[in-house]
């Protein structure tokens, strides 16, 4: 059966107190609306329509790579009105449409699949996702008849004292038979205190026609919406622990899961150990047997097997097998570090290639450079890559030794098996096998301190 989905993402999110549209606030490194889209894709949903309004262009930009369609809700006149705005997307389709909200990022693909299966097997015209909660205050209640079938949804403010005792709540997420939904959308009215068109009224219309309406109860955490910064933090914590549990089940050791921050799309292979305080973001891939000591940030990078990283930042880069990084190293985008290399403390690498076995142990800047294997950089080496207008390239051959406090003024080439004397400023090509010394000859002026009256 054909399966489609509509995501309601037009709300202003006033309680967030933010210029950013609510659905674009991130949970575990990804916008809430993109979390929902990803979940629906994993649920074999064929077409997805995003109903947008507030900050529409920003939402489009953030979701441009997700292959969703868009419907515009110029005025936010309720959830029923949002489905009216998606009418063009729904017309001509047969089957089931799942309706979700863009501010509920905790729903899982397993739950979506279960809901659709429940809907189809029961031959329901509408299915409501519900949850049993300890404190149902503020939520619409699911009222069932003596046979356990859904009778109606009653908003909290309209509940009788007996109905207030019901702790099964409406999540605001549904599955509908598309044709029945379309047949009833125009029957909605806004004769209520808010002057809005409520999607819950569709349930009542269907029941009046004698249509079957079902309800499936799910984990309360999955239906939690985000309307405030506090709820955003709560969703972050729930999803973070869910992600961390998945990695541990796959053979990753997390020393302190509550204080380890791993993004939704991060991949980690078995026998890697992650200490607390690490932040792994984007499309990062950590291969087997790595050790990430406390307090590193790694984003959109590939870390090969056997790497050790201490308190460092690695962005959009590649680190080869059995390399050590840090503490306090900064590897900037488009860098590639070879195998068995050493990138030490207070070293910054930018848009450079570092060969296998090369050691850059401390207090060094390498930018826009191609460095061979087996090299050694002394403390305080700087690749002077910027002339005030252009970023220039430096090439350093294999097995070269760069002495302490050396400036390599780009563009410049240092060939294989060369030595650069400490304190040199290199501006010309150094031939293979040569020693380059580029510093003034030392001069000692006898008795100078006494002559200047500086002797103590």
Swiss-Prot record:
InterPro entries: Bifunctional_GlmU, GlmU-like, GlmU_C_LbH, Hexapep, Hexapep_transf_CS, NTP_transferase_dom, Nucleotide-diphossugar_trans, Trimer_LpxA-like_sf. Coiled coil: none annotated. It is found in: Cytoplasm. Its cofactor is Mg(2+). The keyword Metal-binding applies. Keywords: Acyltransferase, Cell shape, Cell wall biogenesis/degradation, Cytoplasm, Magnesium, Metal-binding, Multifunctional enzyme, Nucleotidyltransferase, Peptidoglycan synthesis, Repeat, Transferase. Pathway: Nucleotide-sugar biosynthesis; UDP-N-acetyl-alpha-D-glucosamine biosynthesis; N-acetyl-alpha-D-glucosamine 1-phosphate from alpha-D-glucosamine 6-phosphate (route II): step 2/2; Nucleotide-sugar biosynthesis; UDP-N-acetyl-alpha-D-glucosamine biosynthesis; UDP-N-acetyl-alpha-D-glucosamine from N-acetyl-alpha-D-glucosamine 1-phosphate: step 1/1; Bacterial outer membrane biogenesis; LPS lipid A biosynthesis. UDP-N-acetyl-alpha-D-glucosamine binds at residues 8-11, 22, 73, 78-79, 140, 155, 170, 227, 332, 350, 365, 376. Residues 230-250 are annotated as: Linker. Acetyl-CoA binds at residues 385-386, 422, 439. Mg(2+) binds at residues 103, 227. Disulfide bonds: none annotated. GO terms for biological process: cell morphogenesis; cell wall organization; lipid A biosynthetic process; peptidoglycan biosynthetic process; regulation of cell shape; UDP-N-acetylglucosamine biosynthetic process. The keyword Chaperone does not apply. It holds the Pfam family Hexapep. Its EC number is 2.7.7.23, 2.3.1.157. GO terms for molecular function: glucosamine-1-phosphate N-acetyltransferase activity; magnesium ion binding; UDP-N-acetylglucosamine diphosphorylase activity. Residues 251-456 are annotated as: N-acetyltransferase. Homotrimer. Catalyzes the last two sequential reactions in the de novo biosynthetic pathway for UDP-N-acetylglucosamine (UDP-GlcNAc). The C-terminal domain catalyzes the transfer of acetyl group from acetyl coenzyme A to glucosamine-1-phosphate (GlcN-1-P) to produce N-acetylglucosamine-1-phosphate (GlcNAc-1-P), which is converted into UDP-GlcNAc by the transfer of uridine 5-monophosphate (from uridine 5-triphosphate), a reaction catalyzed by the N-terminal domain. This is Bifunctional protein GlmU. It comes from Clostridium novyi (strain NT). The lineage of its organism: Bacteria, Bacillati, Bacillota, Clostridia, Eubacteriales.
């Amino acid at each position: 059966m054909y399966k489609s989905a509509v995501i309601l993402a037009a709300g202003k999110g006033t309680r967030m107190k933010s210029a950013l549209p609510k659905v674009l606030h991130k949970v575990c490194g990804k916008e809430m609306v993109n979390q929902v889209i990803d979940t629906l894709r994993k649920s074999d949903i064929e077409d997805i329509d995003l109903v947008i309004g507030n900050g529409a262009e920003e939402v489009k930009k953030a979701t441009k790579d997700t292959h969703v369609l868009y419907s515009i809700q110029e005025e936010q006149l309720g959830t029923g009105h949002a489905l009216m705005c998606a009418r063009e997307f729904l017309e001509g389709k047969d089957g089931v449409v799942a309706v979700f909200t863009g501010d509920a990022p905790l729903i899982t693909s397993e739950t979506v699949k279960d809901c659709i299966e429940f809907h189809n097997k029961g031959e329901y015209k509408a299915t409501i996702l519900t949850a049993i909660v300890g404190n149902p205050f503020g939520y619409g209640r699911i009222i069932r008849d003596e046979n356990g079938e859904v009778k109606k949804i009653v908003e909290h403010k309209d509940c009788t004292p007996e109905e207030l005792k019901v702790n099964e709540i409406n999540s605001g997420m549904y599955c509908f038979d598309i044709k029945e939904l379309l047949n009833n959308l125009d029957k909605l009215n806004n004769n209520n205190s808010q002057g809005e068109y409520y999607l819950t009224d569709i349930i009542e219309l269907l029941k009046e026609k004698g249509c079957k309406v079902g309800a499936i109860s799910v984990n309360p955490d999955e239906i939690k919406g985000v309307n405030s910064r506090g709820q955003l933090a709560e969703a972050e914590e729930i999803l973070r622990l869910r992600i961390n549990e998945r990695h541990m089940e796959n053979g990753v050791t997390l020393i302190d899961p509550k204080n380890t921050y791993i993004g939704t799309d991060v991949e980690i292979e078995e026998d890697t150990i992650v200490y607390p305080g690490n932040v792994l973001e984007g499309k990062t891939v950590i291969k087997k047997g790595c050790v990430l000591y406390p307090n590193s940030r790694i984003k959109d990078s590939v870390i090969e097997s056997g790497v050790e990283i201490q308190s460092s930042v690695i962005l959009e880069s590649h680190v080869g097998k059995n390399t050590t990084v840090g503490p306090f190293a900064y590897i900037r985008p488009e860098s590639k570090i070879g195998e068995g290399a050493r990138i030490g403390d207070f070293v910054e690498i930018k848009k450079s290639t570092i060969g296998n076995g090369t050691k850059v142990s401390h207090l060094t800047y390498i930018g826009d450079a191609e460095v061979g294997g087996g090299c050694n950089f002394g403390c305080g080496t700087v690749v002077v890559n910027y002339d005030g207008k252009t970023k220039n390239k430096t090439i350093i051959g294999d097995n070269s030794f760069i002495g302490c406090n050396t400036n390599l003024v780009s563009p410049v080439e240092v060939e294989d098996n060369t030595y650069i004397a400490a304190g040199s400023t290199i501006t010309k090509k150094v031939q293979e096998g040569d020693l380059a010394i580029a510093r003034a000859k030392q001069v000692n002026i006898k008795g100078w301190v006494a002559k200047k009256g500086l002797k103590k």
